């Protein structure tokens, strides 16, 4: 279901992701890169989309192999970056030999993978002993609720189910001439961390980053995201 959605949204997503300072990535990705270890031999990005995370990792010295389930997104990623390898494949069945990477990165992609648990297990398979998995997801609390308004002090209301099995979410947004439909799977914390535990990972670090004060000074509605976490990030190591 998720793969078909992103195939349809590929062009819209490329326009959205590539407009500088347009979406949350520009505010939150520095927190994520602070979690990522220094480059070693090979880094795998799973769910690379149009490739912006891989390009940013390359600028930080990583040698990247990136995969995505969408043909269109892989084509866009290749067009923007001839220095790395981009492959279309299922994250739940990676075409790599065991213990062939030092680092696996999932930036806002675990919730887009139909079989999240198998994707985590596959990441463990292709990582060397002591290899690291770094991930960012929409925070499970943010997925379960909404702010009542755009005001900085707006109440946050949980109006969906947090506990239990995964649930499908979708949101349509039009802003500054760009249109995007976001959709994927929402999990509770136990869903993500249970998958890591069963795959043999130990969590080293967890972050719930907040926007900084200069961001709030430019847009007072961002104060909402200093009270409720928008994203959850972690670093885990393969035993």
Predicted regions and their residues:
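Conserved class I S-adenosyl-L-methionine
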Residues: 1-39, 52-56, 73-76, 80, 132-171
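Class I SAM-dependent methyltransferase SAM/SAH-binding core
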Residues: 44-46, 50-93
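A short acidic, Gly/Pro-enriched loop at the edge of an enzyme's catalytic core
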Residues: 92-103
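A short SAM/SAH-binding and catalytic strip from SAM-dependent methyltransferases
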Residues: 103-116
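A short glycine-rich, Lys/Arg-flanked "PGG" loop and its adjoining helix->strand segment in the class I
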Residues: 117-132
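Acceptor-substrate binding/catalytic loop of class I
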Residues: 141-145, 176-190
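Short alpha-helix
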Residues: 183-206
């Amino acid at each position: 279901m998720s793969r078909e959605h992103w195939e349809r949204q590929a062009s819209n997503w490329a326009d959205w992701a590539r407009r500088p300072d347009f979406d949350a990535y520009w505010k939150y990705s520095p927190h994520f890169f602070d979690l990522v270890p220094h480059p070693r031999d090979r880094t795998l990005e799973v769910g690379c989309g149009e490739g912006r995370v891989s390009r940013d990792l390359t600028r930080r010295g990583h040698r990247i192999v990136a995969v995505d389930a969408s043909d269109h997104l892989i084509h866009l990623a290749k067009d923007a970056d001839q220095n790395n390898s981009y492959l279309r494949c299922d994250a739940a069945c990676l075409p790599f030999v065991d213990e062939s990477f030092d680092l696996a990165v999932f930036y806002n992609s675990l919730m887009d993978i139909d079989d999240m648990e198998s994707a985590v297990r596959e990441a463990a398979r292709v990582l060397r002993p002591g290899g690291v998995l770094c991930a960012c997801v929409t925070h499970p609390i943010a997925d379960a609720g909404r702010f009542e308004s755009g005001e900085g002090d707006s109440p946050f209301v949980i109006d969906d189910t947090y506990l239990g099995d995964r649930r499908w979410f979708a949101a349509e947004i039009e802003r500054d001439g760009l249109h995007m439909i976001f959709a994927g799977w929402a999990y509770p914390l136990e869903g993500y961390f249970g998958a890591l535990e069963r795959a043999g990972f130990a969590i080293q670090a967890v972050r719930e980053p907040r926007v900084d004060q200069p961001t709030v000074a430019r847009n007072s509605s961002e104060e909402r995201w200093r009270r409720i976490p928008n994203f959850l990030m972690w670093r885990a190591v393969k035993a």
